[in-house]
């Protein structure tokens, strides 16, 4: 068993990853994110990642109505840290590949070789209609076809002195982008569709997967590993997990109930509608959703022992290469996790490699 990677999903949007009026409410500020990044550095996590979001979901909490821009914030955090990997998110439908290539070559230089590019293809119409770049004629498959060509262009610009490409989505003519990065930035991609997994196997170094069950997660992880191997490559698999840790299971469960009681149903409905669910159906679902819907990912609640055992179980059973963690209370929770759970996970990994 190889050592696993553990990192955090930074709270780059207000409210972090909880849609609740009673949960902790990180603000969309550099100060918040810098503190979280420094906690990650100090406790020994492997990476920090931020999303890219252009429009929030309203509701009582105005969830993600305020968010920072991923690339500029992560460049600042690269300067503020020394060790953790710096993974920023880039929309392939927003940025010309020549612009993206130059930006990430710069981040790779600033970070001393720690940069990573989380590539997303822009699936939510509401984010991009507001500034006139949503192409409603592109299907899901078309967006991945565009993203494959975009990624090919970026990676070629990182290593070739001149690139010419003519595609339905962009044109490069004798395009130069120097200096080249000292090493290629890590490429990350999230998604579980057939098109997403095909893209991950061909281009990504890491894939973020979300299964509706542990069985599905296991199947997805095995599929991405196998597809990448068939392409002569290695692609690590990750999932996301929210950690609610306290001294006892009962105290952690109490937090879950308190935060669930304040679930922001309007924001939930708006989020679901952004996925393409008809508005009446989205609102009907949100009105009947249980409080746990306030959590945007799977979660574990409990003592240090409970959290440790749960993480070991899901990572082992699904053959994941790591997890990206979310902490509702970043300041105190990350310190507690670093003092208790993370050392146990590292010891478990080390024992497994002997």
Q: Where do the PLM segments sit?
A:
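Active-site mouth loops of central-metabolism enzymes
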Residues: 17-30, 89-98, 181-192, 243-246, ...
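Catalytic cores of alpha/beta
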Residues: 98-105, 247-253
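Conserved, mostly hydrophobic/aromatic
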Residues: 40, 44, 77, 107, ...
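An alpha-helical appendage that flanks or caps ligand/catalytic pockets
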Residues: 2-4, 8-12, 38-42, 123, ...
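N-terminal beta1-alpha1-beta2 module of alpha/beta enzyme domains
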Residues: 1-80, 180-185, 256, 283
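Hydrophobic faces of well-ordered beta-strands that scaffold small-molecule active sites
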Residues: 4-8, 48-50, 86-90, 115-119, ...
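Alpha-helix-loop-beta-strand connector modules within alpha/beta enzyme cores
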Residues: 61-87, 146, 342-351
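Glycine-enriched alpha-helix->loop->beta-strand junction motifs that scaffold or abut catalytic
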Residues: 80-83, 111, 202-208, 318-319
